[in-house]
Amino acid sequence: MAAALAVRGAVSAPAFGPEALTPDWENREVSTGTTIMAVQFDGGVVLGADSRTTTGSYIANRVTDKLTPIHDHIFCCRSGSAADTQAVADAVTYQLGFHSIELNEPPLVHTAASLFKEMCYRYREDLMAGIIIAGWDPQEGGQVYSVPMGGMMVRQSFAIGGSGSSYIYGYVDATYREGMTKDECLQFTANALALAMERDGSSGGVIRLAAIQQSGVERQVLLGDQIPKVTISTLPPP
């Protein structure tokens, strides 16, 4: 998952003397990576993510589930520090559950996104968390919200995040079109994630997908031999 940890005020290791033989791992930035995505369609949303969790060059987990349920019809995609995003997701799930009980009705997707925004903004100096919130509610139907690091919130027709997203902005912008069906969104998401996993060394593993509609949540996992092989010849015409 995409994050960076560094010691504040750290100085570089000396070039000479006994200290030069000491590893400077405390001063190095430890990077991790991920690729997450969500797309809105008429009647619901599709979410997707890779499953690799890394710490620098070390792969800590090959089958991480980065699609986290927040409520019955609301999920989030997590990028950043795994510990930070898990803690934030747990806190929002807890608050949203109480909110739903008080109102005696399912929560709105916008409410869930606002809770993420408030927490990510309040603790922006301490958190490494980029979140995509997507789901369905009776008022607005399918919705996708992005809360990047820092706590800004914006609603979008689709959102991508994580270190792998840098490699697929062009593909996503060129390929996305309004009015896609659920199956088209699932294929679109799988293709985009496969492209990111091909280029980003911090993204990999399997592809996890979820489609959320009024009828419920459908989840699927694409294993290695099921991940799309996207080439120039397989791309749709412009």
Curated annotation (Swiss-Prot):
- Keyword Secreted listed? The answer is no
Active site (UniProt):
34 (nucleophile)
One GO term under biological process is: proteasome-mediated ubiquitin-dependent protein catabolic process
Which EC number(s) does UniProt give?
3.4.25.1
Pro-sequence residue ranges? 2-33
Q: Which reaction does it catalyse?
A: Cleavage of peptide bonds with very broad specificity
Sites of the modification N-acetylalanine?
2
EC class = hydrolase
Query: Which SUPFAM superfamilies does this UniProt record tie to the protein?
Result: N-terminal nucleophile aminohydrolases (Ntn hydrolases)
> In which compartments does the protein localize?
Cytoplasm; Nucleus
Any one GO CC term of this protein is:
nucleus
Q: Which residues get modified to Phosphothreonine?
A: 68
What keywords does the record list, in alphabetical order? Acetylation, Cytoplasm, Hydrolase, Nucleus, Phosphoprotein, Protease, Proteasome, Threonine protease, Zymogen
What InterPro entries does the annotation carry?
Answer: Ntn_hydrolases_N, Pept_T1A_subB, Proteasome_bsu_CS, Proteasome_sua/b, Proteasome_suB-type
GO molecular function terms here? endopeptidase activity; threonine-type endopeptidase activity
> What this chain does, per the record?
Component of the 20S core proteasome complex involved in the proteolytic degradation of most intracellular proteins. This complex plays numerous essential roles within the cell by associating with different regulatory particles. Associated with two 19S regulatory particles, forms the 26S proteasome and thus participates in the ATP-dependent degradation of ubiquitinated proteins.
Q: How does it assemble?
A: The 26S proteasome consists of a 20S proteasome core and two 19S regulatory subunits. The 20S proteasome core is a barrel-shaped complex made of 28 subunits that are arranged in four stacked rings. The two outer rings are each formed by seven alpha subunits, and the two inner rings are formed by seven beta subunits. The proteolytic activity is exerted by three beta-subunits PSMB5, PSMB6 and PSMB7.
Name the family.
Belongs to the peptidase T1B family.
User: What protein does this entry describe?
Assistant: Proteasome subunit beta type-6
Native source organism of the sequence: Rattus norvegicus
Which gene is transcribed and translated to give this protein? Psmb6
